[in-house]
Amino acid sequence: GGRMRDATSIQTLADCLHFMQVGEIERAIALFPEDVREHFPKELRKIHLFHIEKNGLSINQIVALANALTGEHLSATTIQNWTKREVRKIIGVPRIGKKYSLHQAAIIYLLDDLKHLFSLEETSSLLALIFNNPDRDEDDFIKPIDFYRLYAEYAKSTSPIDLLDTRAKRSLEKTKYTHPNIIHVLKLCLYAHRVTTLELEAKQYLNRFI
């Protein structure tokens, strides 16, 4: 599978989903690299018309969005498989026609980041600690996009993960989210992110000598 997203890419994706969610589509579009904006991939040509009440994203659009924003290689086949496997319990069914909501897209991006360290079963159980029933948003301990933004904020940090509790609690106090599971899941996501980052660095270093 493709490279893990670096902290900057995670932040860009988080911002894009957030702007789309609050209806600031121009700000979302401004995040794409200039060459992409000049020639949007066909899946994203209508992105400027995106309306949160009316539009969802297909799996191909979820993939195209991440790849165009971050130069990643997320695969539609992988996600298609997830929607048939155990992990579909956490993604939920397509909500808007045959398409997924932006919150569901955030869950898919999280799954992609976590799959490097945890099995799909572990990942499902882990995300179920904060996202209860994927087909309803109101029972989540935190909205998926807001959690993805929190994760983006901390993915940049290099402090020891077990020392992040106090800081993360302060970040959360500024929001309406208070459930202790949020911090536990955040830390597990950060472990996954760091393990993969270290693995990548190690391999790049090795390749200089062999």
Show where each model-derived region lies:
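Short, Lys/Arg-enriched N-terminal segments with co-localized hydrophobic residues
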Residues: 1-3
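Basic helix-turn-helix/winged-helix DNA-binding cores
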Residues: 5-129
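Intrinsically disordered, low-complexity, charge-dense segments enriched in Lys/Arg
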Residues: 123-210
